[in-house]
Regions:
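A short beta-strand-loop-beta hairpin characteristic of the jelly-roll/cupin
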Residues: 86, 93-123
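A short hydrophobic beta-strand segment most commonly corresponding to one strand
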Residues: 101-104, 141-153
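A short, N-terminal "cap"/entry segment at the start of jelly-roll beta-barrel domains
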Residues: 1-77
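Conserved metal-binding segment of the jelly-roll/cupin
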Residues: 86-88, 114-116, 120-134, 138-141
Length: 153
């Protein structure tokens, strides 16, 4: 599958930088980065449905893509597996959802759960969100790229 990169969300210009950061972190992330480099242009990137103001920094500064599950490259009924990209200095606002969620951090960023403090995660770290917990994430001076999985069942 080949996708015309002109259809990518503008924030996708940060993917090479994110993958370079991850590729410098060790053999596992280097291999994952190389595989993702060959895949990301095929993915259906779109802003979150939580963002409707097309002029907002959040709308222009983030994108999600589903790889497996509803709306992804491969349909699956019990899991959604995808990736989120956040441009530098953008916050993905507080939200919650019924499915349990896990993240694998590809390029660093901060997470917050419930009313807790922000906590930093580096490439290769993980984050776990229990069902219906309020959570948010934000990037710093570098873009944040993270793979996520939602258990639908």
């Amino acid at each position: 599958i080949t996708k015309d990169i002109s259809n990518l969300q503008p924030v996708c210009k940060y993917i090479p930088e994110s993958l370079q950061i991850a590729g410098n972190q060790g053999p596992e992330l280097k291999q994952l980065s190389a595989k993702f480099q060959s895949l990301y242009k095929q993915l259906p990137w779109h802003p979150s449905d939580r963002s409707t103001d097309k002029k907002s920094a959040f709308y222009r500064g983030h994108a999600n893509a589903v790889m497996t599950g509803h709306g992804g490259l491969e349909e699956h009924s019990s899991v959604r597996f995808g990736v989120s990209l956040i441009a530098p200095n953008i916050e993905y606002p507080n939200h919650k959802h019924p499915p349990e969620e896990g993240y694998l951090v590809i390029s660093e960023g901060d997470w917050r759960q419930a009313n807790g403090d922000w906590f930093h995660r580096k490439p290769g770290d993980t984050v776990h969100n229990v069902p219906n917990i309020w959570h948010a994430m934000r990037s710093g001076k570098s873009p944040l790229l993270a793979v996520w999985m939602l258990w639908i069942e």
